[in-house]
Swiss-Prot record:
Superkingdom of the source species: Bacteria
GO molecular function: structural constituent of ribosome
Alphabetical UniProt keywords: Ribonucleoprotein, Ribosomal protein
GO process annotations (BP): translation
UniProt GO cellular component terms: cytosolic large ribosomal subunit
UniProt-listed Gene3D superfamilies: 4.10.410.60
Protein name per UniProt: Large ribosomal subunit protein bL35
Matching HAMAP family: Ribosomal_bL35
Family the entry assigns: Belongs to the bacterial ribosomal protein bL35 family.
InterPro entries according to UniProt: Ribosomal_bL35 (IPR001706), Ribosomal_bL35-like (IPR021137), Ribosomal_bL35_sf (IPR037229)
Organism listed in the record: Dehalococcoides mccartyi (strain ATCC BAA-2266 / KCTC 15142 / 195)
Length: 67
């Protein structure tokens, strides 16, 4: 059976941890940050875990767990 192809757009946006969790970046980081508090801006910089309902779809996009 041929190798499965990794969707490169998904590989740039998600990464898989050593324990198998799929992590993503949070949105709202690029602009319109001035009216947000420093605490909220720091929270946007953290990585977030992908929701369980989306996990199976993303695993199909990155079958080899590209990090």
């Amino acid at each position: 059976m041929p190798k499965m192809k990794t969707r490169k757009t998904a590989a740039k946006r998600f990464h898989v941890t050593g324990t198998g969790k799929i992590m993503r970046s949070k949105g709202m980081k690029s602009h319109l940050r001035r009216n947000k508090s420093a605490r909220v801006r720091r929270q946007f910089d953290e990585m977030s875990q992908v929701a369980g309902v989306d996990r199976a779809r993303i695993q199909k996009l990155i079958p080899y767990g590209v990090s």
